[in-house]
Each structure stands twice: as structure tokens, then as C-alpha cells.
Amino acid sequence: MAVKEGEKYDLRFYLNAPGYKGTLTVEIYDVEKGKTVGSETLHPASLDHWTELTATLQAASDARHCELRIVFGASGQSVVWVDYVSLFPQNTFKGRKNGLRKDVAEMLAGLQPQFMRWPGGCIVEGATLDNRVRWKETLGDPMTRRGEWSLWGYRSTYGFGYHEFLQFCEDLGMEGMFVANAALGCSFRNGDYTDDPAELERYLQDIRDAIDYAIGDPS
């Protein structure tokens, strides 16, 4: 990953290391130059259970090829589990929390797009219906978003969810095209579907809810 001099990056991660007593140093390490360009030492009271840890790291210099490192200060051995590691720039497009990378968003803005679709095409269907994108699961705290294996061969974190999509449309003054599943999985990969009336009604209600979330009365 690349960092810019003076920019701040919010780190959030979860650790479970039963019995570990000691400090942790989190650092942005410049692999090309072999040096640390930003770090902070944490003093967790206990890691005997899953614990959320946060820090703000500021880059001392520009660096193109960096790693995030977690250095354990105590000697000895311990089993460590790590989950949900997020290093996010504070300087996002329009200052949005959990917003878009500024340079990418500015390039998109320069194209002056008239609309954007979300979540996409085939990913809406999913490899199977069970694998489809569920927009309600892309809302809220990014850590609680379940994510989904994508039929394109990688896992989607849902980090850019329905809410972020709507915000981005507002920021660029473009129309938002919400693509809904029509109770049909990808016909090329599986072709499963439902024609049960009660199940179809749930699909329709989900679409109505999405429209209401976007343009309905906020009260």
C-alpha cells in the first residue's frame, strides 16, 4: 500500500491472545527503504478475549510500497488470533467517513458521470440465490457487514455499501441506479430461481425498502 507524508490513517483491528501480557507496536513499514514511516505503541489491559484496538498513524514521508506490521513487545510464546484489520485514510473524498479514496473518486468526478449503478450486474444474481448481494447487509458499521464470496473469484467485504453508494451519487450530482435481484440466480453458473408467491413478495418488499431508504421520509 502507498502512504503520503503528513496524512493520517485510522487503524482498527481485533486481537485475541489469551495470556499475552505486554505492549503492541503497530507500524507502517516502508519495504523499499527498509524503515518505519509511522507507528504507535498500544498498551492493552488484556487480550484474553476478542478486543478491539485502534490507533491513528501519521506518515512521516511518502512511500509507495508499505506493509502494516503488528510487533509484540513481550518475550515468550502466545497464540494470537487477528480479525478485521482496517487501515483507512482520514483524508477521503469529501471527508466522508468510510468514504472513497480521494484520488480515485476525483478521477471519476472528472468524467462527469450522469449515473452509477450498484451493486453491479452478475454479482446481483450471485453464483446462487443464496450468494446474491443483500443490500441491507451492506449498511452500518463496516466491521459488522458480513460480506460475501463474489462469483468473480474474490471476497467482497461490502465496505462500499448501499449507503456509501447513495452518498457518492449525491457528492457527484449523478443519478443512482439500484440493481435489484428478480428472484433469479446466475443462469450461466446455476440458474436457480424461486416462483413461490410468498418468497417473491419478500423480494419485492426488499426492493421497496431499498427505494424507501434512498428517497423516503427519513422520519
What are these regions (language model features)?
Residues 1-157, 170, 175-177, 188-201:
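Extracellular and organelle-lumenal recognition/adhesion modules and their flexible linkers in secreted
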